[in-house]
């Protein structure tokens, strides 16, 4: 190997040995091979020849000369181009000075490093002590903060419990007023029905007697009582809303304090050896606080004072409601007793059409049952077809990942595609049939509703002819009902659980109001029967009624 640009004194630049051997003939030129693949390397990749020096170099092959060739050595005629002189660059003095400088620099660096190490140890001890003291102080502050939060939280919880108790009392009172006003719909509708029935009297019986006068006074008194109770219930509802606002404010404050207490307790329990600690850069520069300790305590104190004012208002409303209950119940019972002293009733009936409608309703119900079973079977069939469709589609999806020429459109591929189309067509057919069955079921349900409505109308007509005024007025709501302690259920007849009102009227129809009336049909609570079953509103009769919900009023002539 011969390097270019070296000094004459280098051992590898000696005179070239002349060898007596003949030079070998030049080898044939190697064929040029071009790589079709160029490798891609990520940034920072070091190639295999990265170790080679950057100076020019040349590799030569040389045969070793025998011993007799050494006598013919001669100095080279051309010196290397980088050689500037034939003498050394430095003197002994320069060499000594350089060594001395290196030793003194190393000593100075060592002394400086020793002083720096000592100072660093002292700084670490001082900062460790300072940080430990600051951490202890912060922990004490966090503990005090947790105690303050716990105190205000307990005060808020105590006030919240009292407010919840008062709100429950107000809710109960509101329900009592609503139930009492709703309960008065029954005797009110009875009185109105009696007036309507008496208007159907013929001839000399159309007399404005004491019964009619008492009925009018009873209707006016019942409406007046309802208005007073509803107005008071509306005031109580507004107060409940105010209580709920105060409750929400307390709950939000308690929730915030619970979260803050949990966070501060977690921060207080954090130690240097905790697993949940981490770096959060820049948090010391972010100030998201919105209050100071004084405003923080004042906020909770204002919530407590506001809650106390709401409770005082609620207590005054409850006292007013109790006085109203006591006064109105006495007046209603006195007027009801005076009205019942002068009443008589007439009875008639009509059942033929109702029985036919009931028979048709039974057939419709059976057909609805069959349609529901068919829908269930169709839905099961659709669900059962989904799994084979998933299998076929999954197989197709998996076969799309075959490599290269293996993506063959073979018989399996054709069969899978055909299977998917067949199953999908089957599903569409079943879904179409399911929709048709559901439409048929909807039509049956609508027919059933119409039949039930017709049954209610026929039952109402039957009641007009069968049950008259005295059957409706055999009882009156008790004092607990008038004061709202008990309330008849939705869909039940008036005066439910009152033995005199539950009477039979010569038929086999079972009414949702708890009475049987002359027919053979079940009227689901919507038919008027014997004056004791509820009416859903004015749709069952030719006279308007003011019932607010099913089960709360009578049909006009029921």
Swiss-Prot record:
GO terms for cellular component: axonemal A tubule inner sheath; microtubule cytoskeleton; sperm flagellum. Pfam families: Tektin. The keyword Cytoplasm applies. InterPro entries: Tektin-like, Tektins. One of its GO terms (biological process) is flagellated sperm motility. Keywords: Cell projection, Cilium, Coiled coil, Cytoplasm, Cytoskeleton, Flagellum, Ubl conjugation. Its main location: cytoplasm. Ubiquitinated, leading to its degradation. Deubiquitinated by USP16, promoting its stability. Specifically expressed in testis. Sperm-specific microtubule inner protein (MIP) part of the dynein-decorated doublet microtubules (DMTs) in flagellar axoneme. Forms an extensive interaction network in different conformations that reinforces the helix bundle composed by other tektin proteins (TEKT1 to TEKT4) and MIPs to anchor the tektin bundle onto the tubulin wall of A-tubule of the sperm flagellum. Belongs to the tektin family. This is Tektin-5. The gene is Tekt5.
């Amino acid at each position: 190997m011969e390097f270019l640009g070296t000094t004459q004194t280098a051992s590898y630049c000696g005179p070239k040995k002349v060898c007596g051997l003949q030079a070998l003939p030049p080898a044939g030129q190697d064929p040029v091979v071009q790589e079709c693949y160029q490798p891609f390397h990520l940034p920072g990749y070091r190639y295999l020849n990265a170790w080679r020096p950057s100076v020019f170099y040349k590799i030569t092959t040389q045969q070793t000369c025998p011993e007799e060739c050494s006598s013919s050595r001669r100095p080279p005629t051309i010196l290397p181009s980088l050689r500037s002189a034939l003498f050394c660059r430095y003197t002994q003095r320069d060499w000594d000075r350089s060594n001395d400088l290196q030793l003194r620099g190393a000593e100075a660096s060592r002394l400086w490093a020793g002083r720096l190490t000592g100072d660093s140890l002292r700084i670490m001890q001082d900062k460790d002590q300072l940080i430990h003291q600051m951490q202890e102080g912060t922990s004490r502050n966090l503990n005090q903060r947790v105690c303050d939060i716990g105190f205000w939280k307990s005060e808020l919880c105590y006030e919240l419990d009292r407010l919840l108790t008062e709100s429950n009392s107000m809710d109960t009172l509101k329900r009592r007023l609503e139930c009492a006003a709703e309960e008065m719909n029954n005797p009110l509708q009875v009185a109105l029905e009696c007036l309507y029935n008496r208007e159907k009297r013929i001839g000399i019986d159309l007399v404005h007697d004491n019964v009619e006068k008492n009925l009018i006074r009873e209707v006016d008194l019942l409406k007046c009582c309802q208005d007073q109770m509803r107005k008071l219930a509306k005031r109580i509802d507004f107060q409940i809303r105010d209580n709920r606002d105060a409750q929400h404010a307390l709950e939000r404050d308690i929730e915030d304090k619970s979260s803050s207490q949990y966070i501060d307790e977690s921060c207080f329990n954090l130690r240097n050896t905790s697993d949940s600690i981490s770096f959060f850069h820049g948090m010391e520069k972010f100030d998201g606080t919105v209050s100071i300790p004084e405003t923080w305590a004042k906020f909770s104190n204002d919530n407590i004072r506001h809650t106390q004012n709401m409770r005082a208002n609620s207590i005054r409303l409850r006292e007013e409601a109790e006085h109203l209950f006591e006064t109105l119940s006495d007046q209603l019972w006195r007027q009801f007793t005076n009205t019942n002293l002068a009443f008589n009733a007439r009875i008639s009936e009509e059942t033929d059409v109702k029985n036919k409608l009931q028979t048709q309703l039974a057939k419709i119900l059976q057909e609805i049952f069959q349609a529901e079973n068919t829908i269930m079977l169709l839905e099961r069939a659709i669900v059962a077809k989904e799994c084979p469709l998933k299998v076929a589609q999954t197989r197709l999806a998996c076969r799309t990942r075959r490599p290269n020429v293996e993506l063959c459109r073979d018989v399996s591929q054709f069969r899978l595609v055909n299977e998917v189309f067949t199953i999908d067509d089957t599903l569409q057919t079943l879904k179409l049939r399911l929709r048709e069955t559901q439409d048929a079921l909807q039509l049956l349900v609508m027919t059933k509703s119409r039949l039930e409505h017709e049954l209610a109308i026929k039952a109402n007509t039957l009641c007009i002819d069968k049950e008259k005024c005295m059957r409706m007025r055999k009882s009156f709501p008790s004092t607990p009902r008038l004061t709202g302690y008990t309330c008849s259920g939705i869909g039940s007849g008036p005066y439910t659980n009152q033995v005199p009102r539950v009477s039979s009227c010569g038929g086999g129809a079972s009414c949702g109001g708890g009475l049987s009336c002359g027919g053979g049909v079940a009227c689901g609570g919507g038919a008027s029967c014997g004056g004791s079953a509820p009416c859903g509103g004015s749709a069952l009769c030719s006279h308007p009624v003011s019932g607010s919900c099913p089960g709360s009023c009578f049909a006009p002539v029921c």
